[in-house]
Structure formats: C-alpha cells, structure tokens
Amino acid sequence: ISIDTRRSDVAAAALDAGANMVNDVSGLRDPAMESLVIARGCAVCIMHMQGEPGNMQQNPTYDDVCSEVYESLISTANKLVSKGHDSAMICLDPGIGFGKNLTHNLELLHSRSNSDYSILWGVSRKSMFKQLLGRERTEDRLAGTLGVAAHAMLEGVDILRVHDVEAHNDLLTTLATLRPELNS
C-alpha cells in the first residue's frame, strides 16, 4: 500500500496505518520526508517535478530534460542510500506530465536511466494524449496509455502506475507471451 503525498506528516500517519511505501511527487523536498523514509525503512518512489503543482506547467524549460531529470533523481536516491536506506527500496519516476511539455515527455519516454534503481512510469490517461491524439476526455486515452505501456515493457521499465488494471494485465500478458525474454 502506497501513500501519494508531499507531506511528511501525512506519510507518517499513512505508514502508521499500514502503508509500506511513500510516493512523493515532490522528490523529497519536505526535509522531514527524507528522515521519515530512512527511519521507517519503507519503500519510496522519488518523482521529478519542476516547480509546484500550481505552476509546474507554466513554460517548463530544460537544457537537457533527460540528463537533468535523472541526475536529480539519482542524486536524491544516492543521498538516501548514503544515509543507510536500502537501494532496493527506492524507485525513480521521471514525472511524465509534471513540469514538462509534450516534447519533454516524449524525450523522457525515449530514454531511460542507466542507474541501478528501479524505474516507474506513470503515464495513465495523461494530458499528453490529449495533445498527441486529440483525446479530450481522460477515459478516451486508454489506447495511447497502452501503447506507452507496451513501449515501457520493451524498454525494461520496472513499474507502471495505471488506472485500467485489467487492460494493462491483458496487454502485458500478451506481450510477454509473444516475447518471453521480457517476462524475466
């Protein structure tokens, strides 16, 4: 069970209630979050976001989005490990759609970190499919989402965050049947 929060007090309450993973969309910007994650020894997903939720889509800019995003994530993860956190309990999320425009998102989807940390992609129903495919309604973005999920599996992405679990299970089962080497 994962708690999706940027606030260490909320994460602590969720961990007390039985959650075993913190998914922090701010990349551990709350100084107390790092200490909490280390003290509890829980799994953590560190996500990249340029800016804050209220302003993150206002002209996001990068010199090299892939390098900047993954260097930031790896630096944060390495800091946790240097303070005693188990690297196997850390996954990195490049934050598709969080402080990135369509070009940035596509560049990130065409690249992958060469770190030893697990990689998570959360692309389910994202607004990029509105731009890419003209799908206004989120419920009409499944085909695009599944296309990226197939690409993710072929690229070796470790974890997908999805809404349509059954459709993704069918896709990944079919792809693993056709490409057994991907099932390892």
Predicted regions and their residues:
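Short acidic capping loops at alpha-helix termini that bridge into adjacent secondary structure
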Residues: 86-89
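Active-site-adjacent loop and "lid" segments of alpha/beta metabolic enzymes
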Residues: 5-9, 15-16, 20-79, 98-184
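Conserved C-terminal portion of the radical SAM core fold
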Residues: 81-83
